[in-house]
């Protein structure tokens, strides 16, 4: 089963947009993500609907970030991309006749609910400015390593 990568891809795009003070065209984003510009426009429209980006048509136009990274949580973006399913596993039969299957389903359902709530809480508490900071730390470390290799 293929993983849904809309969340990570849009987080990737938003962080790049925050670093560069220019509009990003759908073509530019599609090249970055190695996908179709139509897919980009469809997904970015969800971010626009939630007030994270805006778009300008015509020459010099494109998508621009209009909300501060400190005001956007991972959960906000998760919602904006359509709340993709978190788990690929589940119960085959929601109304089993077998009591063994019933208790298995109940145990799994409870575990899934608890795990999903834990993840949702984590997504809500993590702002995009933290990711931007973490990137900067990694970037600085990368540059320092490259410079030390040259000396």
State what each model feature region is.
Residues 50-66:
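Beta-hairpin "wing" of winged helix-turn-helix
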Residues 12-15, 75-79, 121:
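Generic alpha-helical structural context detector
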Residues 69-94, 112:
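Conserved segment of winged-helix/HTH DNA-binding domains
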Residues 1-33:
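Extreme N-terminal segment that seeds HTH/winged-HTH DNA-binding domains in transcriptional regulators
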Residues 96-151:
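C-terminal regulatory/oligomerization modules of transcriptional regulators
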């Amino acid at each position: 089963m293929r993983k849904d990568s809309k969340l990570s891809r849009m987080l990737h795009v938003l962080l790049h947009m925050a670093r560069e003070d220019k509009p990003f065209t759908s073509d530019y984003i599609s090249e970055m993500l190695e996908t179709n510009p139509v897919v980009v426009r469809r997904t970015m429209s969800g971010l626009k609907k939630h007030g994270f980006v805006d778009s300008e048509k015509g020459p010099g136009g494109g998508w621009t970030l209009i909300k501060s990274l400190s005001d956007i949580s991972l959960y906000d973006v998760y919602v904006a991309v359509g709340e993709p399913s978190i788990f690929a596993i589940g119960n085959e039969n929601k109304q089993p006749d077998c009591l063994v299957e019933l208790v298995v389903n109940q145990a799994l359902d409870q575990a899934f609910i608890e795990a999903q709530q834990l993840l949702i809480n984590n997504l809500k508490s993590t702002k995009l400015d933290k990711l931007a900071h973490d990137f900067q730390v990694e970037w600085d470390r990368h540059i320092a390593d490259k410079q030390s290799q040259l000396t």
